[in-house]
Design a protein with these regions (language model features):
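Positively charged N-terminal leader segments that act as targeting/secretion signals
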Residues: 1-4, 8-11
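Short pre-catalytic strand/loop immediately N-terminal to key active-site residues, enriched for Gly-Thr
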Residues: 65-73, 279-290
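Short alpha-helical functional segments enriched in proximate histidine and acidic residues
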Residues: 114, 302, 329, 333
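Short hydrophobic alpha-helical segments enriched in small aliphatic residues
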Residues: 11, 16-17
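Glycine-rich phosphate/adenosyl-contacting loop at the front of the ribokinase-like
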Residues: 18, 23-95, 102-106, 113-116
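Ribokinase/PfkB-type carbohydrate-kinase core domain
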Residues: 26, 30-48, 110-123, 136-278, ...
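Short, small-residue alpha-helix embedded
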Residues: 82-84, 286-314
Length: 347
């Protein structure tokens, strides 16, 4: 497979004025027609905790620590993407079936705070709410690490993630579709849940650009992932989530994007071979959580600014420009604690 590299490197420390001007003018992207996105997936209420060691830290010893809650807000891939695009000025319509716990209500409130339209978000006793605790600590050798623990709000029953039903006379997905009075410019989702895949397939049949993100691929469920990818226009995943790329040969009518961490990003448009773009270097990394979500949201936003919200609009030049802009945002966000640090620092 042909692989090309394009060298357009930036260093965040040298381009702060550029990225800050992008941030300050974020809502000037679309004066004539406000773009819209509908998105769904597995949402979390993230609690970001930092461990402090009041008596100092000695490698190899059991050190006393205290935990300080730094941030508590909606997170996860779909939560971040939809909130970031709401902040960018899009009409952002998340779909979510939360419970009516305090945590579930906060997630809805957070969506509104970031500019989302919560018309398709519900808080009911039958809903589900996921909680994720992210602890910033030091390992036994004194190196910074992140520890993750997922839990669920009181009253959230199994299964934790709630979705529309697709079968039976009382199926809720057909009712949702029947009640829609508009088509978004983009439909985004990140799970293999049948309802969200079927909604994406239907959206695509109506001319909506469908963006599918693979967070983690379990090979025993590979056929489900492949089905989602085949029914989408844009497919994105990281090199950590997906290592074997042999299936990409079956996606020759797609845009496939793979993020490479510190090595940058690469894309394959319509089976023409991989094009590798360099990273945007940041010499002041605080927290890399959420960088992939910033890449996704900023890439979608960059496409919108260029009027490229139809798959036919995608060219190598447009994708290159948009992915480099997306990496600018993702790299900048790494200088802040939390998945939406840029927003917090600029509001």
């Amino acid at each position: 497979v042909e692989t090309r590299k394009i060298f357009l490197g930036f260093v965040i420390g040298q381009h702060d004025a550029y990225i800050l001007s992008m941030i300050n003018n974020r809502k000037a992207m679309n004066k004539e027609k406000k773009l819209s996105i509908m998105g769904v997936g597995s949402y979390n209420l993230d609690t970001i905790v930092k461990r402090e060691y009041p008596e100092g830290f000695v490698p190899g010893k059991r050190n006393k620590f205290v935990e300080k809650v730094m941030i508590e807000e909606i997170g996860s891939n779909p939560g971040n993407v939809m909130c970031i695009l709401g902040w960018f000025g899009w009409d952002s319509y998340p779909i979510a079936l939360f419970d009516d716990s305090e945590e579930g209500m906060k997630m809805t409130s957070d969506m509104k705070r970031y500019g989302c339209n919560t018309r398709f978000v519900s808080n009911t006793p039958e809903g589900g709410t996921n909680l994720l605790k992210v602890t910033h600590a030091l390992d036994d050798y004194g190196k910074p690490v992140r520890k993750f623990s997922k839990r669920h709000a009181p009253g959230s029953g199994f299964p934790r993630d709630k979705a529309f039903t697709v079968r039976g006379k009382d199926a809720t997905l057909p009712k949702f579709i029947a009640g829609l009075d508009f088509f978004p410019d983009v439909y985004f989702y990140e799970s293999t849940t049948a309802a969200w895949r079927d909604l994406g397939k239907w959206m695509r049949s109506k001319g909506v650009m469908v963006y599918y993100e693979v967070q983690r691929m379990y090979m025993k469920e590979f056929p489900k992932y492949l089905k989602c990818m085949k029914e989408s226009d844009i497919v994105k995943f990281s090199d950590e989530a997906v290592e074997d790329l042999s299936f990409v040969d079956e996606l020759k009518d797609k845009l496939v994007i793979q993020t490479l961490g510190a090595k940058g990003v690469r894309f394959n448009l319509r089976g023409a071979g991989w094009v590798t773009l360099p990273p945007v270097v940041n010499d002041n990394v605080v927290d890399t959580e959420g960088c992939g979500d910033w890449t996704t949201a900023s890439f979608i936003n960059a496409l919108g600014k260029r009027g490229a919200v139809k798959f036919a609009d995608l060219t190598f030049e447009v994708i290159t420009e948009c992915l480099m802009e997306a990496q600018e945002y993702a790299s900048r966000n790494a200088s802040f604690l939390g998945t939406k640090g840029i927003i917090t620092a600029n509001t």
